[in-house]
Amino acid sequence: MAECSALRAGCLVMAAGNASRFGENKLAARFDGQSLFSLALAAIPAEMFARVTVVSQYPALLEEASLAGFDTILNDRPEDGISRTIRLGTRAMADCAGILYMVADQPLLQAGTVRRIVDAWQEHPNCITAAAHNGKRGNPCLFPSRFFPELCALEADRGGSSVIRRHEDALLLVEAGERELFDCDTKQALEILKGNA
């Protein structure tokens, strides 16, 4: 993929978690005939990004991402929490003007929503731009490069929300459908989503 340049964002797909509440690799779980991970990749409008990087502990997911043309990084210490995934991906795309941080367990997230987040950030490049529904923030979130040092300083299972809480004045919300922001942290959550599909 291309090198990052002015107002060109990278996209980091965070797919390295242990899914302890799910009981197994939840990203292999099926929804509407596809794995959660495949649906996450399908929601990425790759043309909007200078680079897409997938961080995972699972070789099969890294292989799928590589076949899709995306960069991959093995997280060999997922027990260190989401902060390690954030750090690995952020350092790999440190030359980008911003990075969209995307979880991989939102099967109803639409590529159009991701496009609108990137468009809004390009109009307001100093803002943290996040998907939201009726004012309630969700994922994904796009952070300008000025926040990379704080993101790289995160520890254990602390994610980008702790950075956002310190910079609420810089937050720009982009409206999304409520169901798009629903993440499948448990098998029960996935079954609920299937029942409402």
Which stretches of residues belong to each language-model region?
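Conserved alpha/beta core of the MobA/IspD/sugar-nucleotide pyrophosphorylase nucleotidyltransferase superfamily
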Residues: 2-7, 155-197
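Nucleotide and nucleotide-moiety/phosphate-recognizing core
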Residues: 3-137, 169-177
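Phosphate- and divalent-cation-binding pockets in alpha/beta enzyme and binding domains
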Residues: 21, 60-64, 150, 183, ...
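Short aromatic/basic micro-patch
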Residues: 30, 108, 142, 183-184
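Short loop segments at secondary-structure junctions
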Residues: 58-59, 145-146, 187-188
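Short histidine/acidic/glycine/proline-rich micro-motifs that form metal-
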Residues: 107-108, 147-149, 179-180
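A generic structural signal for short hydrophobic patches within well-formed alpha-helices
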Residues: 114, 147-151, 189-190
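Short, glycine-/small-residue-rich phosphate/pyrophosphate-handling segment
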Residues: 137, 141-167
